[in-house]
């Protein structure tokens, strides 16, 4: 619910015909002579666009949202009329709050305070309820101690569902009812365990109110028997490290290990009656529940998306709430690859006398929008073609329109469209005849939207009415200051193109050339892939002026960078994605090597200084690319890599590689190690010399390497590495004074073989 604190000032700009100046369909190159510096680019870009994010309020008046004034008060504003009303005075706002959520009728606010991070999305907090009319602040639980995991308002009444100690509670008008009694270290009610949070939901909750607020669907996870993994924290955020590191034990299922089991439950809010719904779509040990959605405007029907363990078979199961009867209303075999969990089911209601819900599927080979009957039956395709729907932005059941983003122009672009599920007519809301990257945020009733142009030029945001997508009502964010600032700089020259593989597929490439590029000079090159399944790095979104832009701009470095999206990456169709199924690390490095050979056809490319650097999956890809020993790459930097997918978590790995039993040949037989420390030891024991291997540990950092000053140190080290590599001369490799070859040169001694 966090919203912009400066939006109300921006709205004073008034009516705008169109963004000025108009954006060219290409990245900016600047207009001056200044070059980007290290401090401007790392550890994060300081020269960057601003954007506004709104949490729209569903009220009688469309276009309303909550903003915060300079003194901290919460203001109800209308983005169209600029009218505003103070809902919560500044002196009623809890100090140091982390987040807040308004009750649907705007009569109360739920505050989260005393935030303590848990995993990527989850956290612990205290929660308080502010009655706006009375001004009273009441704790959600009288004895709370910063230990509540999640809380959510009912959509219709005065109830709050919350989770504490992995048990589910319902609060209503000051009275609390404990729903479950079995929550504990291994049993989770209404919140996901670590692997479901990280790999399935991408969120911290596993409970869903019915639209009328009368029922609650929730999942229960049981981690009993799931192997544990211990994470040591050596400094543990202390100035002086403790004598013994703090050890965090989490249940971390690896490939072919036991997974958490999951159950589906329904709760009648009024009676507190809980019902366990048997899940028979797949056996308990072969079951993943990926999504839950209510398929009614009240509480008649709810559905869940069930996958088998390796996520290449899918069943949508509908549950009739009154009878508790379950029925498979849709199923799919995706054993040619995997089935992505897109979390895109949404009930739309009656269409020509039959109830439907909308969903995205790539069963045709391309991700498209379909209408599916609530009770099962033949689907209706709303979009088709050799392009993909990326996301559904809004379903407007009054106008019978679905708003979405797609790659219709090109896989690297995003344009906003609507499609009528009555007439199937598809309409662009933007100019879809040129390369651009858009998204949109729609008001609660769908009457207005903020259109966000995100690249390739300087981003901006405008407000539109859905009745007229040609003329903006207002400019929300112009980024005029950034436009002016960039005129002082000479920026890297960014371009996009495709290269064609011998097998016929094309790979998207993003190239950065130094600002003072001279085609008659030789330049070192750094490849910067991610390359993971379904991911995308090469897009027309704003080119962040980050570390990659710095090493391209610094006169002492002047690296050309190439980012190549290999086979397996996203938005180019199912066949392109699924090519890597059961063999991660096989095709991806081949594609990077092929791209490097294509690069070397340019006379300016220095064949003696071609590097590759990747993070996470990109770190894995870096190592696998060097492992090919192609003779093309001369150095690699692998950051936070997965090194052996048998040792990564089960729900990610098995989606793409299956289990060891199903894919014995798919395991990496070349390097066996638990983590990067073991890899380092393996390489040293394998005879790799000190001048060819450098390692650095960031012991207390998470995957993003953000603890304390770790990020600052990391980028200084990266800058030194690429500088040292540029200075390296293949005819005279650097040698330490103790090298036998140096001694031989100095004293005429014969160096030992």
UniProtKB/Swiss-Prot annotation:
It is an enzyme of class 3 (hydrolase). Its EC number is 3.4.14.5. Extracellular dipeptidyl-peptidase which removes N-terminal dipeptides sequentially from polypeptides having unsubstituted N-termini provided that the penultimate residue is proline. Contributes to pathogenicity. This is Probable dipeptidyl peptidase 4. GO terms for molecular function: aminopeptidase activity; dipeptidyl-peptidase activity; serine-type endopeptidase activity. GO terms for biological process: proteolysis. The keyword tRNA processing does not apply.
